[in-house]
Amino acid sequence: MKVVWSREDELTWAPFGPAMAIDLAADLDERGEVLAWRGEVWSNGHTMRPGRAKIPTLLAASQLARPFDRPVSVDPPFAGGGGSQRNAVPGYDFPALRVECHRVLEMPLRASALRSLGAFANVFAIESLADDIARSRGEDPVAWRLRHVSDPRARAVIESVARRSSWGSARSGEGFGRGIGWARYKGAGAYCAVVAEVELTHEVRVRRLVIAADVGFAVNPDGVANQVEGGAIQAASWTLKEAVRFDRTRVADRGWESYPILRFSEVPRVEVEVLQREEEASVGAGEAAQGPTAAAIANAVRDAIGVRVRDLPITAERIAAATLAEEAQTA
């Protein structure tokens, strides 16, 4: 027997990346310094992979004449990186912090692992607020980060991308923005920092990504660079375009013709520096760039137009909505 799923089957019935909602707040003193950091995360579980549960997790198991119950997605243990919790704890030297994660058990669509799990959304959110705090003080975003990071390896990737991107140089023109984001994957894995340069016309175009990665001892530096570059391009697509569109009855995108995804003509110039650490243990490179890339692009958009977009993907419609919301707040 041979079973072949069509492209429509894959796009409409396969599990999707979990939805996430993140609420962050920081207590500041009269000088704008962080006294405490608070975060709450709501999300589906981030894995429903076959072989990890006591009952079958494949779709067909729930469609049999005598069906198995469809299991609820779970989060991997936090000690192994977690799911929705992944990178929910910021990598900054704050005096106090509290982070809570809530697993949403029921949603209309099946969810399972998407590359980097919760790190993509968590780093996007954390680095967005970090940038806003720095700007509220009138402080350079790179300088603010370096002032709140004591880990020398984290500082090294931030300093690398700042130097190679000519951070602080003059703007290239109207609609140009530059932003930075960084994280240590899972809080214990690879370090990655990204500077994004964007141009806004009728949509956001990422023109350049400058990346530094520290994976410990890089056995194959070219392979590491390829993994980081691929992850960054994929993250750019998620950040600007990709989303599951559905109505009350079905998933709307049933083929690549309508699904919003980054095209070859939209792929930015990507520059990757691998910081070799022969004295350190090797760690994975494949998921380090996702969160920092999203954060860098979002912060670059904020730099270009002065408006914070808090919902992904960053489409023209969401930029317009964020602009109207900000104007209403200041009116």
Positions of predicted regions on the chain:
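Cofactor-binding beta-sheet edge motifs in enzyme active sites
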Residues: 1-331
